[in-house]
Amino acid sequence: REITDWEKPIYVKIGASRPYYDVKLAVKAGADVIVLDGMQGGTAATQEVFIEHVGIPILSAIPQAVQALQEMGMHRKVQLIVSGGIRNGADVAKAMAMGADAVAIGTAALIALGDNHPRLDAELKKIGSAAGFYDDWQNGRDPAGITTQDPELSKRLDPVEGGRRLANYLRVMVLEAQTMARACGKSHLHNLDPEDLVALTVESAAMARVPLAGTSWIPGSTC
C-alpha cells in the first residue's frame, strides 16, 4: 500500500482448500479483494496429483468464504471474486446467489479467443495433444499463439477476430445470468441470494449448503 500511496486495492488470491480460515487470514492481513480459485480450473501448470486431489470445487468453497466474511462483518466490504470452473451464465448466477461479488474466468476466455480449435489439431498433435485437450498454456508453445512469447506463434492470433469472439462469449454469459435472475423474480443479478437455489443431489446440497430440491432439508445443517 505504501508503494502505491494507498491508490491501488490489494488483491489476495487463494486456492480453495480451507477457505473459511484462509479468508479470515486474508481479511486480517488487510486485503481489499479476495480471489478464491476452485479446483475445477483448466490449468495444467502443476503436478497431476495436485490437479486431481488438491482443493475443492468453487461452489462448495463459496459458502465457507461467505461465512467467514459475515462473521467478521466484512461481507460486501471486502469483495469476494470466485474462479475455477466458471464457464457459463448459470455458473455466474449460482456463484452470485451464494454470496460472491464477481467471478473471474481464465480457460473459458482462451477457448473463446480460439484456443483448442479443431483447425489446430495437426499442430497440437505434434506436441502430444489434440484439439479440445490442450491445457499446457504455461509452456509457451501454444499453437493458437495466445499464451506464448514466440513471435512466430504470436502471428497466428488475430486480435480483432479473437476480441470479437471473446466479446460475444462474455455478452452471452451476462445475458444468461441476467435471464436466470429474472426467472427467480429478481430485477438485478446482485439481488440473487441462497433462497433462489436448490440442489439436485444430497452431496451437492451438503457442499453448497442449500436445500435438497423438493424439501427444506440442508444436509448437515437442518433436520
Language model segments and positions:
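C-terminal extensions of enzymes
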Residues: 153-223
